[in-house]
Amino acid sequence: RQAAKGLSEALRHREARKVYWAAVAGVPNPPAGTISYGLVKGSGHGRQGEGEKMQCIHPDAISSTEGAKRAVSDFMVLSRLANRGAWVALVPITGRTHQLRAHMAEIGNPIIGDGKYGGSGQQNLGDGWGAQFGGDISKKLHLHARYLKIEHPFEKRIIEIKADLPSHMARTWKTFQWDLAESPNDPFIDEGL
């Protein structure tokens, strides 16, 4: 129980390193960088706020936008499918709700399968990425917590956890011929970012 509490605290205080993998529509340009748009909760359409989503706020407007919070994400293209799609590694420097999803959509490369932030093109109906990829890709969100590095709360040793891709993403990687062996656990460390 205390170990779980210690791990929760480490995550809350940003003492953990989390690397996510995503398949995105298009290819980010530049192929690596930092997204610093703030986030503010937009109103939903349902009675209880259902359907609400985070809206990106330009960094210069964060302090003057009520409810806006600073949000920072690093990204790096690991592989690409011409200009149609890319395998991207993502690290949330801050930990805001839907941060990675909103940030990737904001730079014009929404995560495949993200109906909330990617728009109607994410429904794989023959427009948007569905047409680009031939309609063979799962409609599920293509975002995966791939790697976690954290210090054990009592033993003070480093724990590293690597999670396999979920089946729908593994099929996409196979379809696009993206080789999992091409990527280190944390490409940002290996690239000096």
Regions flagged by a language model, labelled:
Residues R1-L193:
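RNA pseudouridine synthases
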